[in-house]
Amino acid sequence: MSDVSNEAARRRTFAIISHPDAGKTTLTEKLLLFGGAIQMAGSVKGRKAARHATSDWMALEKERGISVTSSVMQFPYEGKIVNLLDTPGHADFGEDTYRVLTAVDSALMVIDVAKGVEERTIKLMEVCRLRDTPIMTFINKLDREGKNPIDLLDEVETVLGIQCAPVTWPIGMGQRLKGVVHLISGEVHLYEQGRNFTRQDSTIFPSLDAPGLAEKIGEQMLTELRDELELVQGASNPFDLDAYRAGQQTPVFFGSGVNNFGVQPLLDFFIEHAPPPQTRETTGRRVAPSETKLSGFVFKIQANMDPQHRDRVAFMRVCSGKFTAGMKTLHVRSGKDVKLANALTFMASDREIAAEAWPGDVIGIHNHGTISIGDTFTEGESLSFTGIPNFAPELFRRARLRDPLKLKQLQKGLAQLSEEGATQFFRPLMSNDLILGAVGVLQFDVVAYRLKDEYGVDAIFEPVSVTTARWVHCDNVKKLDEFREKNAGNLGIDAAGQLVYLAPTRVNLQLAQERAPDVRFSATREHVHAKAID
């Protein structure tokens, strides 16, 4: 095996997905703790404490206690290199989450034991389904009272349409929580106060028949557990690696992230069974991770990771070959050669200069406005990775300045924030308005906060008569020009220079579509080959 194949085989690149407040950020902290990446996991609840959760690094996130931008964290574990991409838990940031899911090889779904499958989980699951992403499930907050575990498995299977294969099973919950039993190894991991539940600091019995176990959990509970396990193993599916890798089955674990309990069995199983980097589709051909030439795509752009410097970093997922510091690459969209000199690796907001990176790794490239989401970098081959979408926003606001002299800063700020995908930004053809589009109201708060904090611009967002937007395409240039003339009042340009129809009502959109049968109206736009505008 070549170096590239060896290194690719060691990588495990995944994202954690969940409904807000299911405990995703806490679990992220605990995984990093096991990887030795952080010494002291920051509790998510004590917001006023100086120590904030490692993965929530933007000032606004620290204030509100929600993950708004996705971070990238890398840590070694058991001879493997784990790349963990944290995703925004808040409902308004679905688009950013979707794009992160294009950059991973598998996902970990976190479910609150008391709430079960929630709306956001369903949406994220649909996204994973589009790509057949393999998913493991961690049912969290076992130290609190919650739903019956058998009912939870049934809920996941029915609502999310994926087969469940329980790998660990709870022994009681809430006040009665005694531990979990590992259904594959047979081990029993006890839950005891004051332990940190690493293998070195846990009481583990080799099986349910081990002497001394009955004393620890009580004869009655042991009998109930045996009956329950008989029922569970009869009614559920055994773990099937092929079904999991095809996205048809999810191995299920139970635990309590905040207490570190049940996390290590999950991490050990993940390391053993989650897929390494996979072959990926491009416009020309499929690219295998073992190829010796570098290729990668940008799935996210983050402005101002370092408040001391107005910087922008493009996050690139390496898909094949080896990245070395200072190497020359082809920026496919512009056709220019770009030297990747000071690329970064990440531990949330702690960054280090990357000396090398392999398939599955994520590196940060300093971006001075020339790189867009969806851009591909190669060692010379002209190909582009596909499937990184922009969604039509559902909410729109007009930006108005309190200080009209700050127009230039406002335009720059909006262009940069839309480039990183925090919002979408449209300029109507027939007016000087600056219109923002978002998936949820919180996004406008975030943009207003960041404009003020990072660009010194105080902007107000007012309602505007736009209900929805569609990207407009037509192969016939003459027909497109005609359409443009007739509908100029409803047309605008997005931040990538694409023509967009800004519909005041759904009825108006329907009429426009009926009157222009040759014009295609799209609710999503691929980031591939997006053209940047000043």
Curated annotation (Swiss-Prot):
Keywords, alphabetical: Cytoplasm, GTP-binding, Nucleotide-binding, Protein biosynthesis
Any GO MF annotation of the entry: translation release factor activity, codon specific
Pfam family, one: RF3_C
Keyword Cytoplasm listed: yes
GO biological process: regulation of translational termination
PROSITE patterns documented for this protein: G_TR_1, G_TR_2
Subcellular location field: Cytoplasm
Disulfide pairings: none
Protein function: Increases the formation of ribosomal termination complexes and stimulates activities of RF-1 and RF-2. It binds guanine nucleotides and has strong preference for UGA stop codons. It may interact directly with the ribosome. The stimulation of RF-1 and RF-2 is significantly reduced by GTP and GDP, but not by GMP.
PANTHER family: PEPTIDE CHAIN RELEASE FACTOR RF3
Family assignment from sequence similarity: Belongs to the TRAFAC class translation factor GTPase superfamily. Classic translation factor GTPase family. PrfC subfamily.
Name of protein: Peptide chain release factor 3
Organism for this UniProt entry: Xanthomonas oryzae pv. oryzae (strain KACC10331 / KXO85)
Lineage: Bacteria, Pseudomonadati, Pseudomonadota, Gammaproteobacteria, Lysobacterales
